[in-house]
Amino acid sequence: YKAVQFFFYTQWNALKAYANGKGVRLVGDIPIYVSPDSSDLWTHPELFQTDGEMHLTQVAGCPPDAFAADGQLWGNPLYDWPTHKATGFAWWKRRMQHATSIYDVVRIDHFRGFESYYSIPAGNKTAAGGHWEKGPDRDFIHAMHEALGEGGIIAEDLGYLTPEVKAMLAESGYPGMKIMQFAFDSRESGNYLPHTYPRNSVVYTGTHDNVTTEGWRTNASPEDVAYACRYLRCKPEDLTESMICACLASVSDMAIIPLADWLHLGSEARINTPSTQGANWQWRL
């Protein structure tokens, strides 16, 4: 494994240098949580919610909602935040410093989990028996500013956000995310319509977790397609192009358009379907 890592980082660093030399910046993801079988948990069990024998006591997930009656049971180890705070968030600083050394911009997944997180007793079969716990909130943000400065981070802030989460994001100064596909739910478009975007944001037609925009067009309800066409003043067959243009024309400081959308590819080019196993992360150009 050491040899594989050596070759990987040698090749990756060469690729990054080439891309940067052409004016291309690389954006990478970092999940908020680690895997139960990760080296992170094995080497630092004291930083996670475990008993004295390396067994998890609480795990991560999402509460029940209209889309999942039992919630989502992710099963990741939860952090022992008081211990992290006592160490000045040293482990997190090292983790983020490494990420920013191999990427130019880092997107933190499930950013809201730093304000409060959903905790489920280990061994539960569903997420229904969980509860919310307070996270490190601004203490974590201040530690990241100290270690990294104030730029180079994208906060994945999708979904329901409490006033406390919004306040934490505002204090961080990190741009949040806007998804164009979410704007055209004719039942509830929320703050995803382009005219509502703040400048300090990153807009996507869709992410790796969404169907392609052409796939969205062909699978969305007639009401949603009609809503999008009215808003964008286009014909249904031109929706993908119009949504791309709306992203690029928005006031958001950054727009990210997946390659499959530039090529107008359908659902067969979807990268990932959350909470499923199977043919995920297999699409190739």
Give the ranges of each region predicted by the language model.
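Conserved, well-ordered alpha-helix/loop/beta-strand core segments that scaffold catalytic motifs
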Residues: 6-33
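Alpha-amylase-like alpha-glycosidases and glucanotransferases acting on alpha-linked glucans and related
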Residues: 1-11, 33-256, 260-262, 267, ...
